[in-house]
Amino acid sequence: MTEVVTNALVSVWLDGYVQAWKTYDKEAIGALFSEDALYYYGPFHEPVRGRAAIVASWLEQPDQVGTYDAHYEPVLIEGNRAVTNGRSRYFEQDGKTFKAEWDNVFILRFDEQGLCKEYREWYMERPKN
């Protein structure tokens, strides 16, 4: 089956990404990525290679559950690639007191099954005014 990369597919993938982050569920994380995926935590980082390594890297230093939220959406889709934009918000341990906010851009490449084959992230902290 060949999956066509659409706005809907990318939106569902991004929602799954946020849910996997909120739960740190190994299967939910792994379900996002192809077996041979590359995951770049930043533009100048070496990639984490492969689904198993990506799952393990997510679990190495998890954010405290309940202290963050995020929303991302597609900006541009061309072929099997998508550019997305969104915002991640972090809170103190009480889960309510604002701590920091980050703007995020992801460049994603999908395989024929609609799994992410390449993930690249850019992030900038928003000023606290």
Q: Which residues does each PLM region occupy?
A:
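Structured beta->alpha junctions
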Residues: V18, P43, P74-L76
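Secondary-structure boundary/capping signal
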Residues: D25, A37, G66-D69
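A beta-strand edge to alpha-helix "cap/lid" segment located at domain peripheries
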Residues: T2-V5, L9, V55-N129
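A short gly/proline-enriched turn/hairpin at secondary-structure junctions
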Residues: L38-V48, Q61-D63, W122
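Short beta-strand segments in beta-sandwich/barrel cores
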Residues: A37-Y39, R89-Y90
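Short beta-edge strand/loop motif at the mouth of beta-sheet-based domains
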Residues: E46-A56
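Short, low-complexity N-terminal intrinsically disordered segments enriched in polar/charged residues
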Residues: M1-E35
